[in-house]
């Protein structure tokens, strides 16, 4: 998934950047991006002059840009096998190219130090210059350890260079020119925490209204296979994890609604959003970028980057507008549990149009097997294991968003769990197979679950938990409203909501 791609900048390419740079909003004393890119030139004289200019005008807000360069200098061997310009276009091999870079992946975020034996390699020389310069400016001694640099950087408060986003867009464009359409406009998050996930724009193929079949015809599924169940307006559908994990995104129609079903495999969330913004139909796709290990989508109208977990715009023209994607409820459960509850359900078939190993547990097997993260995040919390599953809820209040995480293990041991949170009386009902559904309790007190799986209140009355309502047997026409909630890995939820409350640690 994460493949190395050589990266070379030449003086010709640097000049091209200077011609492309927007100048509005840049103070007179701010070095232009041509200076930053010249600092990694193969021309030692030009690089020295650029670094002297940066030194004379240095402020902490320039450090993240230099750290970006350290990442892209990490190319391994073959420094001169391909030359790429800042916008992703090829530069001829005789144009004086310089540095290189590649996709980070685990230990490969460190530059191969054995390459420093070859002092004539222009990329090695550029790396040494940038690292030495950054160490002198910051007083840090991280050498070629990119992860150490960015972990340190995340602890710093600084005013970024006004064209930092433009620099990122042009660096990433060496892997896919489409990255240039991002990073325009405002940002609601720190740009130094937005990183490339190792795939091009749209590089993980989405499922476009995938074919479905009935429960009786889905012989490829075992009862213990994990599915994500969604119900809209009385229509039920199961999205098997073994399929969705390979695609991370499905555009679908269910119950008369157009849906964007997004699966962030890294942070463990499946959220079916309505495919509209402000009442207008909008198509979302995979950007190839992450924020704190959370998959970022982009809309095809404005090219704004959206958090797949919060449903909010984070970088681009839509930031600052009062817009947010509308989530629908989803449950994580077994195929046996889902089809028993909804015998009329439809389910995705294996006829996706793609060649993948759709056996249970094949996708991301190594990642799911350990508690290790594929991409570091700036904030973590040790009260639970990184990939411990939690049920995630959030509510808007007058003082902002209130976030709540409830351990899935806690809910499995307390299958009827009631709590007052953010001024709301909530009850979480959990099936024996672990499917969690949340309802507005509305003043009722719920105490237990009987042998038939019905919820029992403090008066001894029984209730049935369905996909829309918690319905009293005494009045099948009534019921308590179900609220959107979804599973997530603890680290992924905490990284987005570090002020979250946690129950069940």
Enumerate the language-model features and the residues they cover.
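Bacterial N-terminal signal peptides
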Residues: 10-21
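Alpha-helix N-cap/helix-start positions at coil->helix boundaries
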Residues: 44-45, 75-79, 124, 128, ...
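Conserved hydrophobic register position within alpha-solenoid helical repeats
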Residues: 47-51, 126-134
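Mid-to-C-terminal functional-domain signal that highlights helix-capping/loop sites
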Residues: 67-73, 93, 98-120, 132-505
């Amino acid at each position: 998934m994460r493949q190395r791609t050589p990266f070379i900048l030449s003086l010709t390419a640097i000049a091209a950047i200077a011609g492309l740079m927007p100048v509005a909003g840049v103070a007179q004393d701010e070095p232009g991006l041509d200076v930053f890119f010249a600092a990694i030139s193969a021309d030692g004289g030009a690089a020295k002059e650029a670094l002297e200019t940066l030194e004379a005008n240095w402020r902490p807000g320039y450090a993240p840009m230099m750290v970006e360069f350290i990442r892209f200098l990490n190319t391994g061997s073959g420094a001169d096998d391909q030359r790429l310009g800042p916008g992703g276009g090829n530069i001829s091999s005789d144009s004086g190219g310089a540095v290189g870079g590649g996709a980070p992946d685990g230990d490969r975020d460190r530059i191969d130090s054995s390459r420093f034996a070859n002092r004539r390699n222009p990329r090695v020389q550029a790396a040494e210059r940038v690292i030495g310069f950054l160490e002198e400016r910051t007083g840090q001694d991280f050498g070629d350890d990119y992860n150490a640099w960015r972990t340190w950087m995340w602890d710093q408060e600084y005013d970024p260079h006004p064209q930092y986003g433009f620099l990122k867009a042009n660096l990433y464009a060496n892997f896919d020119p489409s990255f240039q359409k991002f990073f325009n406009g405002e940002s609601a998050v720190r740009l130094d925490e937005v990183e490339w996930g190792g795939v091009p724009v749209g590089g993980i193929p989405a499922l476009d209204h995938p074919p479905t079949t009935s429960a009786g015809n889905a012989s490829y599924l075992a009862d213990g296979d994990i599915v994500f169940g969604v119900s809209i307006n009385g229509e039920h559908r199961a999205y098997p994890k073994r399929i969705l994990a390979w695609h991370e995104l499905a555009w679908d129609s269910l119950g008369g609604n157009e849906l964007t079903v997004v699966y962030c495999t890294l942070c463990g969330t499946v959220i079916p959003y309505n495919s509209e913004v402000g009442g207008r139909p909008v198509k979302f796709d995979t950007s190839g970028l992450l924020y704190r290990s959370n998959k970022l989508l982009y809309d095809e109208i404005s090219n704004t980057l959206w958090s797949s977990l919060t449903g909010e715009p984070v970088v681009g023209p839509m930031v600052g507008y009062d817009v947010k994607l509308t989530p629908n409820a989803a449950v994580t459960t077994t195929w046996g549990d889902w089809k028993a509850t909804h015998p009329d359900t439809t389910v995705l078939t294996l006829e996706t149009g793609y060649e993948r190993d759709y056996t249970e547990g094949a996708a991301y097997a190594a990642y799911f097997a350990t508690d290790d993260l594929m991409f570091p995040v700036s904030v973590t919390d040790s009260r639970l294991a990184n990939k411990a599953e939690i049920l995630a809820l959030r509510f808007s209040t007058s003082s902002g968003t209130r976030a709540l995480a409830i351990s899935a293990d806690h809910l499995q041991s307390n299958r009827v769990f009631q709590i007052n949170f953010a001024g709301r009386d909530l009850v979480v009902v959990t099936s024996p197979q672990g499917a969690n559904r949340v309802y507005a309790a509305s003043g009722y007190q719920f105490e237990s679950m009987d042998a038939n799986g019905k919820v029992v209140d403090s008066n001894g009355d029984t209730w049935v938990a369905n996909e829309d309502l918690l319905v009293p047997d005494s009045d099948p026409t009534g019921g308590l409203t179900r609220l959107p909630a979804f599973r997530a890995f603890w680290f992924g939820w905490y990284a987005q909501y570090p002020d979250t409350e946690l129950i069940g640690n």
